[in-house]
């Protein structure tokens, strides 16, 4: 049984507290945990208590890492989970961190998918958007629900804008209409547009002269 002889807030990180046992530095834990557990100088702690504290501290650190991971931009649950896994947190800590983010609406795959679709629709087709969301771990049902709201005419118009610009660039180095149309087809395919849209857009764009 060891005795806590000193609690010292870290100079560089006020959220962490150095714990001294029997006059020697032992470890650091979250200031939040110090408060919640009512830890104070002269408390006696055994190895079991130290294990419990270490586990709870790991959960808090994982939660803080999860919050930090979404500070700059939105992420899906899979993206956050993968990042925390790479940092070495165990499954219990990761699950609790994910639950915390969901509870406070910091993590919502449906909201993410909705914003992603709106953001990418001007430069990508629904097929590429679908694949990207699948790679990010969004469920198939959520993806299809969000994609079902896409106006196909609007998607086609966006594809036509891209196609017209592409044709303009291709004509600067290529005069063969057949080769231009083939390159345009592959370009639109790479952007994730479906056959029906590509067929109509290529036909329209090839009749459209767009010179600087």
Curated annotation (Swiss-Prot):
UniProt keyword Nucleotide-binding, yes or no: no
One BP annotation, GO: regulation of DNA repair
Compartmental location: Cytoplasm
Keyword Ion transport set for record: no
GO cellular component: cytoplasm
UniProt entry keywords in alphabetical sequence: Cytoplasm
InterPro entries: RecX_HTH_1st, RecX_HTH_2nd, RecX_HTH_3rd, Regulatory_RecX, WH-like_DNA-bd_sf
Domain of life: Bacteria
Similarity section: Belongs to the RecX family.
Function description: Modulates RecA activity.
Protein's UniProt name: Regulatory protein RecX
Annotated organism of origin: Clostridium botulinum (strain Alaska E43 / Type E3)
């Amino acid at each position: 049984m060891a005795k806590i002889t000193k609690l010292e807030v870290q100079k560089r990180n006020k959220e962490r507290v150095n714990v001294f046992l029997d006059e020697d530095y032992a470890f650091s834990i979250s200031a939040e945990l110090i408060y919640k557990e009512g830890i104070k100088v002269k408390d006696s702690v055994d190895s079991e208590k130290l294990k419990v504290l270490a586990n709870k501290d790991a959960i808090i650190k994982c939660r803080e890492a999860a919050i930090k991971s979404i500070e700059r931009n939105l992420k899906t649950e899979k993206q956050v989970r993968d990042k925390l896994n790479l940092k070495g947190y165990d499954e219990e800590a990761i699950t609790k961190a994910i639950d915390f983010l969901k509870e406070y609406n910091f993590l919502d795959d449906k909201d993410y998918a909705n914003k992603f679709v709106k953001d990418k629709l001007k430069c990508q087709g629904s097929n590429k958007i679908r694949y990207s969301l699948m790679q990010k771990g969004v469920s198939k049902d959520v993806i299809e629900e969000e994609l079902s709201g896409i106006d196909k005419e609007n998607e086609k118009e966006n594809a036509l804008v891209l196609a017209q610009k592409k044709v303009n660039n291709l004509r600067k180095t290529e005069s063969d209409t057949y080769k231009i149309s083939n390159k345009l087809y592959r370009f639109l395919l790479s952007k994730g547009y479906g056959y029906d849209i590509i067929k109509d857009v290529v036909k329209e764009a090839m009749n459209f002269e767009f010179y600087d």
